[in-house]
C-alpha cells in the first residue's frame, strides 16, 4: 500500500499522499499495473484502476480523479474514488532510454475525503502483474511516501533496500555507509539523550544510511 503523512484540517487528522511510485522491470518486457482502493476493515479491494503496458500506450498516462481535480477530458472522474478521497491517481509507462528497462510510474495526490470522518478505513495500494521469471522493483519517494503492508497477508512491506544513490553504483566507486554504534549519547550537561522514534538499532545499518542490492547482484555499501 502507498502510505503518506498526517495533516491536520479543522482539528481532524487526515492522511496526505503526494508523490510518485516508480516500478522498473529487469528488462524491456512490459507489465500490468493496477492502482487499487482497499477496504481495511473488510479486507478486500473495492475498486481497481488498471493500466496495461502495450507498445501503443508507451509514453502515455491515464488519470482517475475526484471532480475538482479533473484537468483534461481524458481524466476519468470516478465516483467510487471520490467517495473516499480528494485528488487523483495517474499511471503511465515508458522504456528507460539509458537502461533499456520498461518502467511505470504511479502519480498520486490524495487526501482523505473531507466529507466524512477520517476513519482511515480505506487505503490506496497497487498490484503488479508480470510474466514468469520477470523481476519488477518498486521505489517510492521516501520524503513523502512509504510502502506498507498494514499487516495484511499477501501484501508487501517496503524497505530501504534500493535507496542507495545512483552516484554510488559505479564499478570503480567505493561506497561507505553508516551503522548505529549506540542508541544514546552524552551531552555537556551531563545527561544522556536518545531518539526512540528514529529507529536506531545498535549494530545495524543506521536509518540515515542508504543501502541496496543492485540489478547486477552487488550489495552496497561496501564499507559500514
Task: Give the ranges of each region predicted by the language model.
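Loop-rich non-cytosolic ectodomains and luminal regions
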Residues: 1-224
Amino acid at each position: 500500500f502507498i502510505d503518506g503523512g498526517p495533516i491536520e484540517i479543522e482539528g481532524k487528522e487526515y492522511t496526505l499522499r503526494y508523490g510518485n511510485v516508480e516500478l522498473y522491470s529487469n528488462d524491456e518486457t512490459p507489465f500490468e499495473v493496477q492502482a487499487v482502493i482497499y477496504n481495511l476493515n473488510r479486507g478486500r479491494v473495492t475498486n481497481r484502476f488498471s493500466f496495461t503496458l502495450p507498445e501503443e500506450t508507451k509514453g502515455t498516462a491515464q488519470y482517475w480523479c475526484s471532480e475538482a481535480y479533473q484537468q483534461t477530458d481524458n481524466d476519468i472522474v470516478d465516483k467510487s474514488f471520490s467517495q473516499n478521497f480528494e485528488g487523483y491517481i495517474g499511471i503511465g509507462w515508458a522504456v528507460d532510454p539509458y537502461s533499456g528497462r520498461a518502467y511505470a510510474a504511479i502519480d498520486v495526490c490524495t487526501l482523505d475525503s473531507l466529507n466524512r470522518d477520517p476513519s482511515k478505513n480505506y487505503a490506496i495500494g497497487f498490484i503488479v502483474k508480470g510474466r514468469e521469471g520477470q523481476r519488477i522493483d518498486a521505489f517510492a519517494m521516501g520524503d513523502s511516501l512509504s510502502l506498507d503492508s498494514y499487516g495484511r497477508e499477501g501484501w508487501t512491506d517496503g524497505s530501504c533496500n534500493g535507496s542507495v544513490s545512483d552516484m554510488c553504483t559505479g564499478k570503480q566507486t567505493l561506497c561507505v555507509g553508516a551503522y548505529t554504534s549506540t542508541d544514546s549519547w552524552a551531552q555537556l550537561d551531563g545527561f544522556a539523550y536518545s531518539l526512540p522514534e528514529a529507529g536506531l538499532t545498535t549494530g545495524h545499518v543506521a536509518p540515515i544510511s542508504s543501502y541496496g542490492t543492485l540489478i547486477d547482484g552487488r550489495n552496497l555499501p561496501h564499507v559500514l
